[in-house]
Amino acid sequence: MLGFFGPLYEQLVGMLRKQQGQLAFDTIDRVNAWFTPFVLVAMTLAISCKQYFGQPIKCWTPREFSGSWDGYVHDFCFIENTYFVPNGTEVTDEARGGRHINYYRWVPLVLLFQAAMFVLPYHLWNLFHKRTTINLKGSLRFFEGALKKLEPAQACESFAGEIWNRLSDIRNSSNKLYGFQATINYFLLKLGFIVNCILQMVLLKHFLDVDDYFWGFFHLWNVEFKGTAEKEDSIFPRIVLCDFKVRNLGQQHQHTVSCIMILNMIIEKLYICFYFWLIFVFVVTTAGMIHFAFQILFRRHSLIPTNLNNKNKMNPTRSHEFIKDYLNFDGCLLLTYVDAQFGAFRTSQVIDGLVHRFTNELDSDSSAVTSLNEDHPERYVAFNTDTIPMDRYARKHHSLIEEVDGPSAPPANEEKKEI
């Protein structure tokens, strides 16, 4: 049904089905990388059905044309360029050489290309994020598998241990970029979605051959609200003219017929909706990226779905150290995704495991420092000869030095006893 680009359609649909169940998605990501391309593929299917199984164009033919000629005119005017002349305007050679309407034949292919453009940023992100220490998709998949195999508490503890090992690798690494590799890739993904929306607008402008990027607002006002489609609409004209020549008795006769573009009425509604949807996606994605950038840079604690100060052995100072030095940017980003996918309760259980390891490490470090700095009792020596037999004393078989523990030396009268 889709002709030579049918395999592209099937491959794109398969990719969207795989992406539907991806864990490493927030709502805005799903709108960009799954919902919008899915709608574009559905639009492609609807327009293709009209082109191949319906009657996309219907032309008024002269009376002398038979039924076979009618079919020929319809097909010819669909595959050849048509042009738009407003009602009440004389059809001149200048009008014939004006703006031709030829985009409608390529709409299904262009829609598939636009859907692929929406999917591309996610697949580029998926290619690079696998090399990061904190693998968002891999970590979430690990937690999902643990919840299926183990008890929830055990799964959260196991996942906390896995995260802690990753965070320890980051802290022990000499490369300071390891702490926010996943965060940088995440922002590049968001930026890719924004750039894609801009490129989509540029593509629409050139594909539809319009004068500016605000064509959607002007079209909606002038055509839909004012009802001047027959006079002013040259973007999605309902009625177009088509020129063709017929050879009869060795001579060519040119005919000009008026055609109703039934397909254009469908394309118009779809593209107007898609135009304003692009604006909505652009605004939402940009606002979401700015909001998350502010949180991850200046209010990282707001990304943690629990109050760390209420945890055992935690206080504001330790909470700040835990977020800044231990979780870092990538750890906070991962916990944000865990909260979005598995809920605040499971995330709080995972954080409990991380905090337990954090406090144990701090306590062990502080105990080691205390043992090195504490005061040890001074050791003194004293001569003790009262109990030494004279024969052993003479042979010096017994040491004359005895260690005595205490804060001070023994009294002087005990040290000065005669030997």
UniProtKB/Swiss-Prot annotation:
GO terms for cellular component: gap junction; plasma membrane. It holds the Pfam family Innexin. GO terms for biological process: monoatomic ion transmembrane transport. Keywords: Cell junction, Cell membrane, Gap junction, Ion channel, Ion transport, Membrane, Transmembrane, Transmembrane helix, Transport. Its main location: membrane. Structural component of the gap junctions. This is Innexin-2. It comes from Caenorhabditis elegans. The gene is inx-2.
